[in-house]
């Protein structure tokens, strides 16, 4: 099996985008490609067809490669939970919640074994593996416990690409410094340098590139222009919030930026709607007067609920809804809409019962066992008989206390509800907005309140749009990238 590793001089150098593009480029050339990231720390996760949890970025890379996402593509997933702790997912299953020091003491050997086993499994099915590193491969204080970068590259004898973000400045110093800090056997694996996020006249770089290649004896195999990333940074909202600058829109949707927000990829399809403006609202900010509010998923529902209550945002949301506003909650946000959340085992912190927003007649009990599964259901609302696909990832079990005043959103009764006025929507389904007809039907409710015409609902799902985006990214990168040095 041939292996390529993509590492970066810093975080946000563009490793994920370059890796994604290479997966699509090589798949087009006839390679049977799989992505791989040994250890990923991310807020966004994806549930595979087998019910395992993996990083959403690696799922996107799998789609770019034209293959089905599998847990072996990301055997270790760390999901930050706040207070310097993370939930550890090993080969798709939750294994515990630990701090950084305890993680490396308890999980380093387990993690490395999971990585090796996963690579062996992937080698049986694929002839090309495109690996993505994390952060920098040259963090001296972390190298001895790095499970993602050069340890994996050495294990695979991978032809390694070093990516630098020139837009930040200091690109040549970053490259030289990174190479100097690598061990000789690691440096020998670097077969090409990619200068990413370049803006300006390409010829202005020529003298610097000539010097760099002479200094390092490593070719610069690509100068990639700035690409407006179609997928958000996997560990922050920084790119997602700035990605679209729409001057004119019909409706505005406010998404509450919870401290421990997760799966904000749910909102990519809404971002892609030209008539929709998305605003992320901090709990301490003014809510304003949007056309709808969405409370997203979170890694710690109760703690984030308490933040909303302490900041006054909880009352602001309730006041907004009582004045005729539309509110939606997804996953943890769905649980917050209920009357009570019960954590009798202290799984999210202090044991106890916590008052919800009391917008839907629900009681949620936090339980140790996580539900993680893909779902295919039929929607009852806002338009009946619409097929909807998505996935669940949650630890709570929710029951309805007054079934006569809510309507089940889907043919699976427990998956979500809407009130009798179609103003309060709650569901457990991540990826619900990926479903084009359902998304447009829901947006049309907001449009009608403004006296606007309906949008057409017979449109493709976001997965078809995603394919167009992936092709576009691959085309742009391929135009400026020479992979021959890493393929020979």
UniProtKB/Swiss-Prot annotation:
Biological or metabolic pathway of the protein: Cofactor biosynthesis; adenosylcobalamin biosynthesis
List of catalytic residues: 331 (nucleophile), 430
UniProt GO molecular function: ABC-type vitamin B12 transporter activity; catalytic activity
A Pfam family this chain is assigned to: CbiA
InterPro entries xref list: Class_I_gatase-like (IPR029062), CobQ/CobB/MinD/ParA_Nub-bd_dom (IPR002586), CobQ_GATase1 (IPR033949), CobQ_N (IPR047045), CobQ_synth (IPR004459), GATase_3 (IPR011698), P-loop_NTPase (IPR027417)
Annotated family: Belongs to the CobB/CobQ family. CobQ subfamily.
HAMAP family from the UniProt entry: CobQ (MF_00028)
Function: Catalyzes amidations at positions B, D, E, and G on adenosylcobyrinic A,C-diamide. NH(2) groups are provided by glutamine, and one molecule of ATP is hydrogenolyzed for each amidation.
Designated name of the protein: Cobyric acid synthase
Source species: Trichodesmium erythraeum (strain IMS101)
Gene of this entry: cobQ
């Amino acid at each position: 099996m041939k292996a390529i590793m993509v590492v970066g001089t810093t975080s946000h150098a563009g490793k994920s985008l370059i890796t994604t593009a290479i997966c699509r480029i090589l798949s087009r050339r006839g390679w049977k490609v799989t992505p791989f990231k040994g250890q990923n720390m991310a807020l966004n996760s994806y549930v595979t067809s087998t019910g395992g949890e993996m990083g959403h970025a690696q799922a996107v890379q799998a789609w770019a490669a034209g293959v089905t996402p599998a847990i072996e593509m990301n055997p270790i997933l760390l999901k930050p939970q706040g207070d310097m702790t993370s939930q550890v997912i090993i080969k798709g299953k939750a294994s515990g919640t630990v701090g950084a020091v305890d993680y490396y003491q308890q999980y380093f050997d387990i993690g490395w074994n999971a990585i090796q086993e996963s690579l062996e499994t992937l080698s049986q099915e694929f002839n090309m593996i495109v690996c993505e590193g994390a952060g920098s491969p040259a963090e001296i204080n972390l190298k001895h416990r790095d499970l993602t970068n050069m340890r994996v590259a050495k294990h695979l004898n991978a032809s390694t690409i070093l990516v630098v973000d020139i837009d930040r400045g200091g690109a040549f110093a970053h490259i030289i410094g990174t190479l100097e800090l690598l061990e000789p056997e690691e440096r020998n694996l670097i077969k090409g340098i990619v200068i990413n996020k370049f803006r300006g006249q390409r010829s202005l770089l020529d003298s610097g590139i000539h010097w760099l290649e002479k200094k390092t004896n490593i070719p610069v195999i690509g100068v990639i222009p700035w690409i407006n990333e179609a997928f958000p940074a996997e560990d922050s909202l920084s790119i997602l919030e700035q990605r679209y600058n729409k001057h004119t829109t019909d409706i505005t949707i406010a998404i509450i930026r919870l401290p421990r927000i997760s799966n904000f990829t749910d909102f990519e399809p809404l971002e892609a709607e030209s008539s929709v403006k998305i605003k992320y609202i901090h709990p301490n900010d003014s809510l304003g007067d949007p056309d709808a509010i969405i409370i997203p998923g979170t890694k710690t529902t109760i703690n984030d609920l308490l933040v909303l209550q302490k900041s006054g945002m909880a009352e602001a949301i309730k006041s907004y809804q009582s004045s005729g506003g539309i509110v939606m909650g997804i996953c943890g946000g769905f649980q917050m809409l209920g009357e009570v959340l019960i954590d009798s085992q202290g799984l999210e912190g202090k044991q106890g019962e916590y008052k919800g927003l009391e917008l839907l007649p629900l009681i949620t009990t936090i339980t140790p066992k996580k539900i993680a599964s893909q779902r295919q259901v039929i929607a009852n609302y806002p338009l009946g008989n619409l097929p909807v696909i998505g996935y669940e990832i949650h630890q709570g079990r929710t029951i309805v206390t007054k079934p006569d005043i809510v309507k089940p959103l889907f043919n699976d009764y427990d998956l979500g509800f809407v009130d009798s006025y179609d103003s309060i929507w709650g569901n457990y389904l991540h990826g619900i907005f990926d479903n084009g007809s359902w998304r447009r039907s829901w947006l049309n409710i907001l449009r009608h309140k403004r006296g606007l015409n309906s949008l057409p609902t017979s449109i493709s799902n976001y997965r078809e749009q995603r394919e167009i985006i992936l092709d576009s990214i691959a085309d742009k990168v391929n135009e400026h990238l020479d992979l021959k040095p890493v393929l020979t």
